[in-house]
């Protein structure tokens, strides 16, 4: 018996890390937070690629360290996929960042810029992206509409991605502003008096009458 399963991922081992694609050169953590909340609210099971929860940017791998045959063949026009495949930084204080024994050379080089983003460093900060992901995952487990509900997109908006999740008569409107300026979203009539469903450790929106105002890289959920 086969069962269809829908996975939602922001990164994988063949594309530039979401920390660089969506976070930009300055690794905009606010943008990465709204991306994380977006992923957790989509229909399907969220699938995290190692390092997404840390906000790791794409690593710069020197030609002599490449392992990807595509990168080796097409350098420098295409630098390959090794930039998203470097070791996970577990311990920012260890010589090998907690990856391996420290006595053997890893398949790909460790990235020094990752030390400050290592698990050991982010665990110390309750407001870190890692702890935000942990809180989101725990919160999502208690939201049956997000776990099992259908999904319907709202009309296209230049700044906001919005959709409605529905399960057993319960509905959640999910709205995410992916732009660097505030945005206004016109609400469907049934959600104009809905209750705000708090996202743990995140927010960035208000409701006034028939519209929702979202801050830069803000997110907001309304529940019926």
Locate the predicted segments by residue.
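Active-site and adjacent substrate-binding regions of carbohydrate-active enzymes
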Residues: 1-224
